[in-house]
């Protein structure tokens, strides 16, 4: 690697870049980052990145133009001048992994990141440029800061409540049915807190994302914060395949088989996948983030939160079994799993795609997202929806630190919409507008997980096929091995 040339640059404030020792790069894969058609070697900058090295390492050998322009408040002033110090002469097309370093089953067949990832305009006349000016108003800045502080306080209170409820439940002080219902709501709320923390730089609290048995905080940094938010509703959006594996299961078997699949994740699968992530090497379908961090001598504390949460979840399961609370545990597991699964897939209408020719990224995001209403009280809906209720602001301002900040930002967004003649639709009601659409999708005929083409001629063939039985067995086994929706 041509490292020494780039290490001679000066960092922010005139200090030298904190480059890892030359020996640390020996044998490390060549890393490049593409921004606006230009290739850069940001390896010497990894230790200096204000958001920590993880966001950069997960996005290595990709076009990160969208992330640069949307995860920074003023990239023209703060980021683009800095990038010039790390420019490479290598053609950008040679720097991009065709599969973006993610498993192929998460992407459409024949996907090629060079040709299939979208590009957008980022000039001064765009919606995002106007929104940045609105967000810079002192009143808006103060409101967002106060909202973040309130969110953190409330998240801490919910975590304390969770500890109290679990202790009372496992001590047989609290009625099992009451505890189960409380845990379903608290797991959903804590996952909402983790959802916000995953977007924050260097926050171990992102592990709260895993409390609902659906999320996986380590892969969420990439699959959610980078790929989904950057490439919403395009072929590069891995969230569009969230239902993927289960759609190959016959509709009458789908709910119980997917439940067993996720139970396998809880018992062993998440742990297997985490160990795999921490040991895997860089390849076309893997980013090898932890392996590269070890090679470069960078800090490796990112997974402490994951192991703390997952040890807690398994201790709960073990103690519940010893205390004779298995049915109560199973009830809260199934309730948490399916409530949060339906919330995830209800946050976008994946069957109703907008105008893919739209070059204004923020306008496209507005067209492809919707807000959700459960009670009509925005802050309460944040917790009941796992942080998904104020969804339009979340997608337009992915760098914000909390769901409360998204609520506080809504007036600024609406002002820009009004000036541009863009309609601001009211939030969709979860019960009457969203769940019926999700239910139709959930109970659709079995189809190929990747292409979504029908697999059987009719419902009888779908449920009586030996091939279907074999698929169900393999799908459950995949959960035990940590393969599937994580």
Describe the residue ranges of each PLM region:
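Polar-ligand-bearing catalytic/cofactor-coordination segments
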Residues: 11, 80, 116-117, 129-142, ...
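B-type heme-binding environments
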Residues: 2-138
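Long, hydrophobic alpha-helical transmembrane bundles and adjoining juxtamembrane helices/loops
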Residues: 110-133, 159-165, 170-186, 193-197, ...
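Extended hydrophobic/aromatic segments used for targeting, binding, or gating
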Residues: 324-363, 444, 456-457, 461
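Alpha-helical bilayer-embedded segments of polytopic membrane proteins, i.e.
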Residues: 146-190, 258-265, 292-343, 461-486
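Membrane-proximal N-terminal segments immediately preceding the first transmembrane helix
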Residues: 125-144, 281-289
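Cytosol/nucleoplasm-facing, intrinsically disordered, low-complexity tails
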Residues: 1-16, 36, 456-460, 470-473, ...
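Membrane-embedded catalytic scaffold of the fatty acid hydroxylase/desaturase
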Residues: 181-303, 352-449, 462-466, 471
